[in-house]
Amino acid sequence: MHLSTSAAAILALSLAGPTMAGRPYFCPLALDAKFLQVPYCCEGFVPARDSKVSFEGVNCIDVSSDEDFVKTCPKGGTPKCCYSIGPKVICTTEVGDGVDK
């Protein structure tokens, strides 16, 4: 069975929707690959290989599970919406406002 890109995106959102309820942040699907993203704080960014819309994060930490989520990273800057592939963290968008708990 082969799903179209839009059907796959709708399926991903329907499966992830209940888990996103009540989060103080919002991360859309990745702009380059339509993966689910979560907030990461990174010390820096370099252009991702073969992409015009994404960046590879440098020394990143996942802050999605922080009890008191804040929009400021420990070393300054703001969290970015990213996904991980192996040891790499790929970021494509800014973190948006979610639903407060």
UniProtKB/Swiss-Prot annotation:
<feature type="disulfide bond">
    <location>
        <begin position="42"/>
        <end position="60"/>
    </location>
</feature>
<feature type="signal peptide">
    <location>
        <begin position="1"/>
        <end position="21"/>
    </location>
</feature>
<comment type="function">
    <text>Aerial growth, conidiation, and dispersal of filamentous fungi in the environment rely upon a capability of their secreting small amphipathic proteins called hydrophobins (HPBs) with low sequence identity. Class I can self-assemble into an outermost layer of rodlet bundles on aerial cell surfaces, conferring cellular hydrophobicity that supports fungal growth, development and dispersal; whereas Class II form highly ordered films at water-air interfaces through intermolecular interactions but contribute nothing to the rodlet structure.</text>
</comment>
<feature type="disulfide bond">
    <location>
        <begin position="82"/>
        <end position="91"/>
    </location>
</feature>
<keyword id="KW-0183">Conidiation</keyword>
<comment type="subunit">
    <text>Self-assembles to form functional amyloid fibrils called rodlets. Self-assembly into fibrillar rodlets occurs spontaneously at hydrophobic:hydrophilic interfaces and the rodlets further associate laterally to form amphipathic monolayers.</text>
</comment>
<keyword id="KW-0732">Signal</keyword>
<feature type="disulfide bond">
    <location>
        <begin position="27"/>
        <end position="81"/>
    </location>
</feature>
<keyword id="KW-1015">Disulfide bond</keyword>
<keyword id="KW-0749">Sporulation</keyword>
<keyword id="KW-0964">Secreted</keyword>
<protein>
    <recommendedName>
        <fullName>Unclassified hydrophobin dewD</fullName>
    </recommendedName>
</protein>
<feature type="disulfide bond">
    <location>
        <begin position="41"/>
        <end position="73"/>
    </location>
</feature>
